[in-house]
Amino acid sequence: GVTYRSVLKTTGEEFTNKNLNLKDNSIGMKSIPAATEEEVEATVKVMGGEDWKLWMQALKDADVLSEDASTVAYSYIGSELTYPIYFGGTIGAAKKHLHQTADEITKEVGVKALISVNKGLVTQASAAIPIVPLYMSVLYKVMKENNVHEGCIEQIERLFKEKRLLADTITDEHGWVRMDD
């Protein structure tokens, strides 16, 4: 088989912004180089919707899906501060593919496929992206002050309890289930 490796990089040009170094809590500047076309393609392979669609087709072919089955993939949009990485970068290309795949699954597999746009989360990978640790630390503080902060488990529990992933799912104008509300 082929091994693909995803990268969190911009497309087009290098991205430089302020960054919070979590090792020593210092603020400095950090840069990320632009991705090559091969890195963009590999990131779409890893983080796009191809595997999701293959799994859903396999479940349909095995006749193990109920008539009213639905499926959901998680996504993230974030602040304009992070757009060069998340929205316009390699992961943005993968997320666009994921969103297109949701439509394909709905039409071709016959299963309601949804995208849940979730709140920001600091991971080992995202902590290496300029501005993200600083942005997330401020975001978490504001969410806590406004009593809207929730952990990952609470967010997904709310997704299934409040957003109703059935026929009457609550979505925005793009058809996305917004958990970053």
Question: Over which residues does each language-model region extend?
Answer:
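C-terminal helical subdomain
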Residues: 47, 104, 108-116, 133-181
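Catalytic loop of short-chain dehydrogenase/reductase
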Residues: 4-110, 117-134
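Active-site loop/lid in soluble adenylation, ligation, and acyl-transfer enzymes
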Residues: 1
